[in-house]
Swiss-Prot record:
Its biological purpose: NAD-dependent protein deacetylase which modulates the activities of several enzymes which are inactive in their acetylated form.
The protein's required cofactors: Zn(2+)
Protein name: NAD-dependent protein deacetylase
Record's keyword terms, sorted: Cytoplasm, Metal-binding, NAD, Transferase, Zinc
Co-factor binding comment: Binds 1 zinc ion per subunit.
Predominant localisation class: cytoplasm
Gene Ontology MF term list: histone deacetylase activity, NAD-dependent; NAD+ binding; zinc ion binding
GO terms for cellular component: cytoplasm
């Protein structure tokens, strides 16, 4: 049983994808066409859109931020916060930009794609909260443009966060995937790296993934929140 592996582990790494967020009511990014007024969301969440179509760019992210104001982290996030304190969770690598991990009190989050909950000026670097976009004020006092602190299409991932995620994956005894299809590179390399370095690999996802065949445990029949709550309950026995 994987609960034994969790109890014995010295380093547990958690990897979360869109499925973790959708259980809290966050629309999957690629299903958020209602925000885009007929445009492809990937086209609006791009470096080109930020440079050439700022009105639509700001409108897209403002609507996304409005959605997140009505969302609360589900109980699975609380379990991860508990595991950070009571088990040896060394990192939570996430593909999500919604900030739900941080809102739930998760401390060791590595956001591969940044956070929509943070803004900064591209000219002077001044940081702002989301109120600037909510109030449709995307201009800094210096005159620069204020953007979300997310990785846009056309931009590279943060090399420092990638390096940390890789190191934690190498050192993991147990690597848990929660709600990721594991098809997006380079993020999908981390569970493979962990497995190659001896970690137990647990995959919890609604659908099958390309790495199911190398996983030690695969769970397709439970919501992520329920899986985490039930696993935590079993660990208390």
């Amino acid at each position: 049983m994987f609960t034994t592996s969790l109890r014995q582990a010295q380093r547990i790494v958690v990897f979360t994808g869109a499925g973790m967020s959708t259980e809290s009511g966050v629309p999957d990014f690629r299903s958020s066409r209602g925000l885009c007024k007929g445009n492809n969301p990937e086209a609006l969440a791009s470096l080109q859109a930020m440079n050439d179509n700022r009105e639509a760019f700001v409108d897209f992210y403002r609507r996304r931020m409005e959605q997140l104001q009505h969302v609360q982290p589900h109980k699975g996030y609380d379990v991860l916060a508990t595991w950070e304190q009571q088990l040896s969770v060394t990192a939570i690598i996430t593909q999500n930009t919604d900030g739900l991990h941080e809102r739930a009190g998760n401390q060791r989050v590595l956001p591969l794609h940044g956070s929509i909950q943070k803004l900064y000026c591209i000219q002077c670097g001044q940081h702002y909260d989301v109120d600037r976009y909510m109030n449709n004020q995307p201009s800094c006092s210096c005159g620069g443009f204020i953007r979300p602190s997310v990785v846009l299409f056309g931009e590279p991932l943060d090399s420092n966060i990638l390096a940390l995620a890789e190191q934690h994956s190498i050192e993991a005894d147990v690597f848990i995937v929660l709600g990721s299809s594991l098809v997006v590179s380079p993020a999908n390399l981390f569970p493979r790296i962990a497995k190659e370095h001896g970690a137990k690999l647990i995959i919890v996802n609604h659908d099958s993934t390309p790495l199911d065949t190398i996983a030690d445990y695969v769970v397709n029949d439970k919501p992520i929140g329920s899986f985490l709550v039930e696993t935590n309950r079993a660990l208390q026995k």
